């Protein structure tokens, strides 16, 4: 079973959710477009104001954790549950899991991919990266580190080699 914190972070602020209501209470109606969260607009606010980012995290992170716990409870007892948590270190969850695999890449590649994927300029991408734990912090908590500087196929090959090692632990 795969539990992806980024997917859950979107889910907990869908229209009609308590999460979206809390975001609107804090940031105002201007973060909405047609009743839905305007992520680029909210991103511009929170990545230029550390206190605003912390406020958003205080709203979203507990809701994501609760939803992740709910999904894990629904898994079969013999299921291997894989959590994808981009902000694992920042949210203090590194000790909550049996094994930690960090997918790592060099900072320049990280910036380039973030700019391409999200349509950000360099300054916006740097602000987002600066809000995250550093590379050394992430790799320090890892049991295994995968190199994501290559192609998706190369990363998939690393995962395929690691999976039997992880599966043997269950």
Residue ranges and their predicted role:
Residues 70-80, 94-103, 107-112, 116-120, ...:
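NTP-dependent small-molecule kinase module
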Residues 7-10, 106-108, 127-130, 152:
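Short, acidic/turn-prone active-site loops that include or flank metal/cofactor-
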Residues 78-90:
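Switch II (G3) loop of P-loop NTPases
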